[in-house]
């Protein structure tokens, strides 16, 4: 999700290496998506240990981007909640950089396996499969 004021706005696909990290707005500490974005960026290059903007919600991140020249990374599943008049701000990350891990962790002593199966089936049916 890229501000029209950001130099990357004109692109359709963005490489992680092209993101100016000082323009990246991320979720606050304790959010697994934040950790995955930091891991992704660190895999490509050194990432600073502090940020100017952090937030606890994707909606707030997008509002910050709307009022600045920044950008943020949002999951594909959030796109359906973005107003149509802001779809021009949606850009794809370059192929190969955009996967997330989803895990279901359960205690070994948990006996309601049918609930776990239903949850797992629901997740699998609703999460986009990574495109190779």
Where are the regions that the model predicts?
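Flexible hinge/capping segments at coil-to-helix
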Residues: 2-24
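Beta-alpha-beta core module
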Residues: 11-12, 18, 56-109
């Amino acid at each position: 999700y890229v501000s029209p004021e950001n130099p990357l706005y004109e692109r359709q696909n963005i490489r992680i290496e092209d993101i100016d990290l000082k323009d990246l707005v991320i979720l606050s500490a304790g959010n697994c998506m934040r950790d995955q974005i930091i891991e992704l960026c660190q895999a490509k290059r050194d990432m600073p240990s502090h940020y100017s903007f952090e937030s606890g919600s994707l909606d707030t991140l997008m509002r910050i981007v709307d009022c600045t020249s920044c950008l943020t990374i949002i999951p594909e599943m959030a796109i359906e909640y973005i107003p149509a008049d802001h779809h021009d701000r949606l850009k794809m990350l370059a192929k190969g950089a955009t996967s997330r891990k989803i895990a279901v962790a359960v205690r070994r002593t948990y006996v309601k396996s049918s609930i776990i199966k239903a949850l797992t089936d629901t997740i699998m049916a609703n999460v986009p499969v990574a495109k190779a």
